[in-house]
A protein has these predicted regions:
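Flexible glycine-/small-residue-enriched beta->alpha junction loops
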Residues: 1-49
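Condensing-enzyme catalytic core mediating Claisen C-C bond formation in acyl metabolism
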Residues: 13-20, 24, 44, 54-58, ...
């Protein structure tokens, strides 16, 4: 391992072409996999299908509204909630606007010491108070200890990060969270995994605004 005073981590997803069988689980699609997440969540918490669908639609509308404000966003079109609710079904219960677009892009962040950061003369710097990572090879899907209704790695990483940062009540102490939003149900479930919503209450929190 090497240490550096200044580093620039960069992320650049690129979606290439490939066959359906070129996968860990052949013929499994991303919409299908996350539709299973939605079904598992709905079954575990006894959620009404229409309530789940409307909560996901609210998330999609919000995300499109945010994209419309970003000049660098791939998709910058606002979508009415009725359009989301009535969009073509991709993988039940996920409709067209519950699924992300396919984009090539990149992002980077410059990470350095507080001393060097101050010398840059910038006024929009942030301090990293905690940094945690949890990864999985997906084998939990083969065990009955995981019911498929949540992201185990998100729960592990967030618990460690909150402990490192000294956060006891994330719902009250955290004012901004940027989450992976590949599908609308992803954000819904992540709200609970990050303890912003109580388990089984994310739908109600979204619909309540």
């Amino acid at each position: 391992y090497r240490a550096a005073h200044c580093a620039r981590p960069k992320l650049g997803p690129q979606r290439g072409r490939g066959t359906l069988n070129n996968m860990t689980w052949p013929n499994a699609s991303a919409p299908g996999s996350f539709a299973q997440l939605a079904a598992a969540y709905r079954a575990k918490h006894g959620s009404a299908p229409q309530d789940l669908k409307r909560a996901m639609a609210h998330i999609s509308v919000k995300s499109h509204d945010n994209g419309a404000k970003n000049p660098k966003a791939h998709l910058r079109n606002k979508i009415p909630i009725d359009t989301v609710m009535n969009s073509p079904m991709i993988a039940e219960p996920l409709g067209l606007y519950d699924c992300c677009g396919v984009s090539d892009g990149s992002a980077c962040a410059i990470v350095t010491t507080p001393e060097i950061a101050k010398s840059l003369g910038k006024n929009d710097l942030i301090t990293v108070k905690a940094l945690q990572l949890a990864v999985s090879n997906g084998l939990e899907a083969q065990h009955n200890s995981w019911d498929g209704s949540y992201f185990a790695t998100t729960r592990i990483a967030s618990k460690r990060a909150y402990e490192e940062a000294g956060i006891r009540n994330p719902r009250e102490e955290v004012n901004l969270i940027e989450v992976h939003d590949c599908f609308s149900v992803t954000e819904l479930v992540t709200m609970e995994d990050l303890h912003i919503s109580a388990e089984g209450r994310a739908i109600h929190d979204v619909l309540d605004g």
